[in-house]
């Protein structure tokens, strides 16, 4: 019996050693791929992480946080993550819906009955339509109202007489205005302003010390400078946001804190698995076809039984969780960059390539 136990222990140790060596080889490949990609795209700086079974298995920094000052990138740098902000808002909203026993099938008017400044057509939209980008509500971006409007009133007054881009429920079309309304609904359910609610209920509670809302004009400690290509030259990329749009964009956060938040989600410290499944399931269009979004999250069914949820951010960052319910395989890949000179492929594509390398190597 003693000999058998010794043999079993040796077998387990050999198996663990092989798995660790295999992982090292995979990460060498992902690092080599990233280093080549960074070089060809002229990415200024990048932090990335890989999680398997909700545990960090690899993370690394590359390049510069500030090109003009030659400040090296470090793993604790804060990034403006743009539309990744929607993931935080989606989770916070669903927690509030659960507390108040409300539903995404309810309308804007159900949540905000006294908002007569909203057009009647807006008041009839459901929360599900707003979250899944199927509302068709006039998109402020189409009318050159970008993500730093002076006030909510300015956006509403400018758009209230504009036509819908499509009938509600008929088309998946990315829409910024919908998250202006979502912010108002979160504030109503939380009974406090959006920024304060997110700070106390999420950033403080889960010790996300780097998480702060604000555009490039706001001084935020340890934040990278973002860059873009303008006529072949590298210049600063002014990602500007104002409070009316914070539910949709405007969050700044480090890679480590983004990981911490997602681990809390996966550990069901915020929502249940059933609630996450609802958020992550693609919303069907009126035609019966799947749209491109769940409830605030990009959501796709991939080949081989895989699914993917997550979001991109300003075309310079990418957060994606991939899983296969049949094989129990899963991987989360997070790429945060501060821009590049030559985006021939974007972070979402790079993210998918890294995930493929990890899943095929397992």
PLM ranges: what are they?
Residues 41-47, 69-129, 166-177, 246-249, ...:
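Short active-site loop at a secondary-structure junction
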Residues 26, 30, 77, 104, ...:
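Residue-level signature of the cytosolic catalytic core of signaling kinases
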Residues 80-83, 98-138, 161, 188-226, ...:
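Active-site helix/loop module of the DD-peptidase/beta-lactamase fold
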Residues 141-220, 244-259:
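Catalytic-site signature segments of enzymes, centered on catalytic residues
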Residues 45-48, 120, 142-143, 212-213, ...:
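Surface-exposed patches in mature extracellular/periplasmic domains of secreted proteins
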Residues 1-23:
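Bacterial Sec-dependent N-terminal signal peptides
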């Amino acid at each position: 019996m003693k000999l058998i136990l010794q043999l079993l222990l040796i077998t387990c140790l050999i198996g663990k050693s092989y798995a660790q060596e295999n992982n090292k080889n995979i990460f060498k490949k992902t690092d080599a791929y990233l280093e080549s990609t960074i070089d060809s795209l002229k990415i200024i700086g990048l932090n990335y992480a890989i999680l398997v079974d909700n545990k960090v298995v690899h993370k690394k920094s590359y390049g510069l946080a500030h090109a003009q000052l030659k400040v090296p990138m470090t793993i604790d740098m804060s990034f403006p993550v743009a539309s990744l902000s929607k993931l935080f808002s989606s989770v916070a909203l669903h927690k509030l819906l659960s507390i108040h026993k409300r539903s995404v099938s309810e309308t804007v008017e159900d949540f905000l009955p006294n908002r007569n400044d909203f057009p009647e057509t807006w008041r009839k939209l459901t929360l599900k339509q707003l979250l899944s980008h199927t509302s068709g509500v006039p998109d402020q971006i189409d009318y050159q109202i970008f993500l730093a409007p002076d006030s909510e009133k300015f956006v509403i007054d400018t758009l209230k007489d504009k036509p819908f881009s499509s009938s509600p429920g008929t088309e998946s079309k990315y829409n910024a205005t919908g998250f202006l309304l979502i912010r108002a609904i979160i504030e109503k359910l939380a009974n406090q302003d959006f920024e304060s609610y997110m700070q106390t209920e999420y950033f403080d509670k889960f010790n996300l010390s780097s998480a702060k809302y604000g555009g490039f004009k706001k001084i935020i400690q340890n934040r990278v400078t973002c860059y873009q290509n303008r006529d072949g030259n590298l210049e600063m990329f002014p990602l500007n946001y104002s409070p009316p749009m914070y539910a949709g964009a405007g969050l700044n956060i480090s890679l480590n804190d983004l990981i911490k938040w997602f681990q809390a989600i996966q550990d069901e410290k915020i929502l249940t698995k059933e609630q996450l499944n609802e958020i992550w399931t693609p919303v069907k269009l009126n035609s019966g076809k799947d749209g491109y979004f769940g409830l605030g999250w990009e959501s796709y069914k991939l080949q081989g039984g895989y699914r993917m949820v997550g979001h991109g951010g300003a075309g310079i960052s990418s957060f994606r969780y991939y899983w296969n319910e049949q094989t129990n395989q899963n991987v989360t890949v997070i790429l945060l960059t501060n821009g590049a000179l030559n985006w021939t492929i974007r972070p979402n594509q790079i993210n998918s390539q890294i995930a493929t390398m990890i899943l095929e190597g397992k």
